[in-house]
Amino acid sequence: MKKKEMFLDYKSLVKSSLIAVVKHALNKTSEYGISDGHHFYITFDTTYSKNEMPQYLKKDYPKTMMIVIENEFWNLKVDQEFFSVDLKFKGKIDHLKIYFSSVKTFVDPSLSFTLNLDIEDKVIYKKSDAKTKILKKKQIENKSNIIFLKPKSS
């Protein structure tokens, strides 16, 4: 393992779990349509280089854009890395391809459900060094956190 590489990168684990929720909701919507009052507000980074959208939308939304998936959407397709959908803007249907890594928020207001995928680049949880040293010392003295397994005798 490289020195800079984290053994447990919680930020990445949380982000990939949140993206999995978004994918699941969009997959179900793609397969069965949307019902029961559900609708989605999805905010994404329009500066993300892989996203595909008409130039006039990039100009109108230079940093972020929120789309609504409710009544007027077509051809919703969900891929491993992105989703694509046709939406109506200014009376015209346009195709958007949005990478999950650019999604900032996912909201289903029918359930007051909000996911914030815009996780900051800082450690989510960090113990102070002093507390960590005390805890390690207690664990070594106590050894209650160690489990020994004996191989089965033949």
Per-region residue spans from a language model:
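Short acidic, Gly/Pro-enriched loop/turn segments at secondary-structure junctions
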Residues: P109-D121
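Short amphipathic alpha-helical patches
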Residues: D45-M53, E120, I124-K131
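Conserved NTP-handling cores and scaffolds of large molecular machines
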Residues: T29, V107-S110
